Amino acid sequence: YAEISRVVLPGGNRIPTLREFLEQGRKDPGTKLILELKKHKTPEIETRIVEEIVSLCKKLNMLDQMEFTSFSEHACREFRRLAPQNKTLYISNSLWTPINADVAKKEGFQLSYSMYVFMNRPELIDRMNEIGVESTLWIVDNPEVVDWAVKHNVGFISSNFPDRIKAYLDALRTVETARNGACNLIR
């Protein structure tokens, strides 16, 4: 950390510690913080890191604001073990070995797939909706993909430009409400 802490980002900022990130988030209790744990070399390392993350969140009384996400099934299981009340999202970009929605439901975590996976395997969304596993599509940065997500009943989308996507969805809702008197789009 000593080396990273000396790096100055554009705007004169530095990379915050996890504690600093959580303390900033604590200032707005209505904000959900999504913490992504990257995959590590061994499950043992992931377990230790998850334990430290959950311990710090508990110490700062932040668990109620947290959602956890990872590309590692093991890390997701550890988050569920140590913070079972928190939403845990398994992320995948594998077209050929996506985690089974039934397994995710049994494990208690939700699923997030890349646009590439969902667009090539839309039946995954159908199965997730059928058994009550939330679906998240990433990364959605253009209106055409938003339209596709709405058409295919994706539950959530993740974007590098959430303000633009929200504005687009708001415009769709306005048009749909004017047309039908109600609208039930992506939450």
Language model features by range: what are they?
Residues 89-187:
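C-terminal active-site rim and adjoining tail of enzyme catalytic domains
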